[in-house]
Design a protein with these regions (language model features):
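C-terminal functional modules
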Residues: 396-491
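Short, compositionally biased leader-like segments
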Residues: 19-42, 415-447, 495, 501-506
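Generic C-terminus detector
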Residues: 462, 468-533
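Radical SAM enzyme [4Fe-4S]-AdoMet core and its adjacent flexible, acidic
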Residues: 4-7, 13, 20-21, 264-434
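Flexible, acidic/Gly-rich N-terminal and inter-domain linker regions that tether
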Residues: 2-127, 139, 460-479
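Short glycine-enriched, charge-decorated loop/helix-capping segments at active-site entrances
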Residues: 147-153, 243-250, 315
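Conserved alpha-helical substructure of the radical SAM core
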Residues: 63-84, 94, 98-208, 212-221, ...
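Radical SAM/AdoMet-radical enzyme domain recognition
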Residues: 160-177, 186-304
Length: 533
C-alpha cells in the first residue's frame, strides 16, 4: 500500500505530484526523479468535501488505476478506481455508440453534472429507469446509498405520471425497477407494479431486502400474480457480514425463507450482493455456487460497495472494484469462472459494468465466452469482418451485454439461444422455459461515489432515477452530486403539503422539483451537509 502523508483520503502517495514537490525541496540540485505512475487522461470530478466540480487525473500505478484530484479549498484526494490497469486501458474497444432518447427533458445551462436530466450532452438513453417510491425502510443498514429513513411516499398517480413520461422519452422502455427505501412496504406497490406492466415496458423489477416476502403470505400471493423480477439483497452467509453491512447479524434464515418462497411462487430472482473490502469478499465464491444451485435464482449482480449516502469511514485507496470481485470469483469457484469469462458492457462506459453468461448442465458450467469469441462481435474500434450469421449474433450479444438484460427473461434466453447457434451448445431441443433452467448470469456493477466520480463515465450512464416532474437523473449523479438530498427534502415537503391540502379541502398542485447547486455548495462549505427545502 502506498505511504500516505495525510488522513481521510487526502493523502499524497509516494510518486504523487504533491509528494514529489515536497521531496524536491530535499533533493540535491541537478538530480531528477521519474514519477512512479503513468498519466493516462484528464477528466472532471468533484471534491468529496464540498462537491465542487474540479479537474481529476487518471493515473496508472502498480498495475492499478487511480484518480487524483485537488480542490482549491480542501486539498488533494486519491482513490482507487480499477484494480487492473491493463483491463481498464483495453476496455475502450467495447465502447458502443450511444442511443439517443426520443426527447430530452432539460436544457444545457450550467454544464455537467448540474443539468440532469437527461440533457442533450448526455451520451446514452435510459436502459434502466429506477423509481424510488418511498424513503422509508424496515431495516437500518449501516451501508445505504439512499440513506433510507422517514421522508416521503410517492402516490400511485405520481408513479403513473413517471411511467408515462418514461414511455414518451424511450418509446419502448426496457426495464423499470421499483426501489426505495424499501418499496415492498409502500401500501400501493402492487398497483404500481401493475401500472408498469400495463404500459409498453418490457420488464418490471422489484428491489427488495426480502423481509416482507419472507413473512407476509398475502403480499407474496399478490406479488406472484404480477410476477416482477425480484432484485434481492443478499450479501453472503456469515452473521458478521450482515452485522456490518445490514446491522442485523441473524437475518440469513429470513432471507433463505424468502428465496424458497419465491421459488415456490415461480418468480425469477437476481441476487444483489454489496461487496465490501475485508468484510465479505471471502464469500463471493459461495454466493456464486449458491445462486447456481437455488431454483429461484437466475443471476447475480455483484456491486462493489460505493460510499455515498450512509456508510462507515473507509479508505478510498483500498475500495473494492470490479477486477477485485472477478479475481475473488475465479479463486473461490475453483475455475468455474475465470477473469477471461467476463466482458465489459458496451452500452454504459465499459469499465462500469461486466457480464458473463454460462450454460449449466448438472455439474457442468460452461461460460459462453469460452466457446464464442465475444470480442469479435463487441469490438467497436477494430473494423472486423463478421462470419456468416454475424450480424444476427452481434445483435444478440449486444442484447446480452447490456445493462437492460434481465436474467431469466424470455428476451435474454432468445438472445442466448441465437448465440449458441454459433458455438454448438446443446440448446436446440430446449424451449425457452427449459432453457431458463440452464442459463446463469453474473453481472458486476461499479457505481461512482464522491471519491471516484468521473464525468466521462457519468455522461454515458444508462441507469436513471425517474422523478415525478419528468427528470431522469443518472444514478451516480443522483447519489454523489446533491440531487438525492435536494429531491428528498422537496418530496417530503410536498407530501406534507398534500396532506394539509386534503385536510382543508384545497386542490393540491405540487410545485416542480428544482435543484440549486450554488446553494448546495454553500451549505456543504458550512459543514451542514444538508439541503434547504
Amino acid at each position: 500500500m502506498p505511504t500516505l502523508l495525510l488522513l481521510r483520503g487526502k493523502g499524497f502517495p509516494e510518486g504523487s505530484e504533491q509528494f514529489m514537490f515536497e521531496q524536491s525541496l530535499k533533493t540535491e540540485v541537478g538530480t531528477k526523479q521519474d514519477a512512479d505512475y503513468v498519466f493516462y487522461e484528464l477528466t472532471r470530478s468533484i471534491c468529496p468535501e464540498c462537491l465542487r466540480v474540479i479537474d481529476a487525473q487518471i493515473l496508472l500505478r502498480d498495475t492499478k488505476v487511480f484518480m487524483r484530484k485537488r480542490c482549491p479549498e480542501h486539498g488533494f484526494f486519491e482513490a482507487l478506481v480499477y484494480a487492473d490497469a491493463q483491463a481498464y486501458t483495453s476496455a475502450s474497444k467495447y465502447n458502443k455508440p450511444g442511443t439517443i432518447p426520443l426527447r430530452y427533458t432539460t436544457a444545457i445551462e450550467h454544464g455537467c453534472p448540474h443539468d440532469c436530466g437527461l440533457c442533450p450532452d448526455h451520451q446514452q438513453h435510459a436502459c434502466v429507469g429506477i423509481i424510488e417510491v418511498n424513503s422509508a425502510c424496515n431495516m437500518d443498514c449501516p451501508l445505504c446509498f439512499a440513506d433510507a429513513g422517514a421522508g416521503f411516499n410517492l402516490t400511485l398517480e405520481e408513479v403513473e405520471g413517471i411511467l408515462d413520461h418514461f414511455v414518451e422519452t424511450e418509446g419502448h422502455p426496457e426495464v423499470v425497477q421499483f426501489s426505495g427505501g424499501e418499496p415492498s412496504i409502500h401500501p400501493q406497490i402492487i398497483p404500481m407494479i401493475k401500472a408498469a406492466k400495463a404500459r409498453d415496458i418490457q420488464y418490471v423489477m422489484l428491489n427488495t431486502n426480502g423481509k416482507r416476502i419472507a413473512n407476509d403470505d398475502r403480499f407474496l400471493e399478490q406479488l406472484a400474480e404480477v410476477q416482477p423480477v425480484i432484485y434481492f439483497q443478499f450479501d453472503g452467509f456469515d452473521a458478521e457480514t450482515y452485522r456490518i453491512i445490514r446491522g442485523e447479524a441473524n437475518i440469513l434464515p429470513e432471507k433463505l425463507r424468502a428465496l424458497d418462497r419465491l421459488a415456490a411462487s415461480g418468480m425469477p430472482v437476481v441476487l444483489v450482493p454489496a461487496i465490501e473490502r475485508d468484510v465479505n469478499e471471502h464469500e463471493v465464491g459461495r454466493i456464486v455456487k449458491f445462486g447456481i444451485e437455488h431454483p429461484a435464482v437466475h443471476g447475480i449482480n455483484f456491486q462493489p460497495a460505493f460510499h455515498a449516502g450512509r456508510h462507515a469511514e473507509h479508505d478510498p485507496l483500498q475500495r473494492m472494484t470490479i477486477p477485485d470481485v472477478i479475481r475473488s470469483i475465479e479463486e473461490q469457484t475453483d475455475g468455474l469462472f475465470t477473469s477471461t469469462d467476463f466482458v465489459p458492457v458496451p452500452c454504459c462506459f465499459p469499465t462500469c459494468n461486466s457480464v458473463t453468461y454460462a450454460y449449466i448442465d448438472g455439474d457442468t458450467v460452461l461460460p459462453l465466452p469460452r466457446v464464442l469469441n465475444v470480442d469479435d462481435y463487441l469490438d467497436y474500434i477494430t473494423n472486423r469482418v463478421l462470419p456468416d450469421l454475424g450480424n444476427e449474433i452481434k445483435t444478440a450479444l449486444e442484447g446480452l451485454w447490456s445493462s437492460s438484460a434481465v436474467p431469466g427473461s424470455a428476451k435474454t434466453l432468445q438472445q442466448f439461444a441465437i448465440s449458441c447457434a454459433a458455438c454448438g451448445l446443446p440448446d436446440g431441443s430446449l424451449d425457452l422455459g427449459e432453457l431458463a433452467d440452464h442459463v446463469f448470469t453474473i453481472m458486476l456493477q461499479d457505481f461512482l461515489d464522491p471519491w471516484t466520480f468521473n464525468q466521462k463515465n457519468l455522461m454515458k450512464c444508462c441507469k436513471e432515477i425517474l422523478l415525478p416532474d419528468g427528470k431522469q437523473i443518472p444514478f451516480c449523479a443522483y447519489n454523489s452530486v446533491g440531487y438525492r438530498e435536494q429531491a428528498r427534502s422537496q418530496l417530503t415537503a410536498r407530501q406534507l403539503a398534500r396532506v394539509r391540502a386534503e385536510r382543508t379541502g384545497v386542490v393540491f398542485n405540487p410545485p416542480p422539483l428544482t435543484f440549486n447547486f450554488n446553494q448546495s455548495l454553500s451549505t456543504y462549505k458550512n459543514g451542514k451537509k444538508e439541503w434547504p427545502n
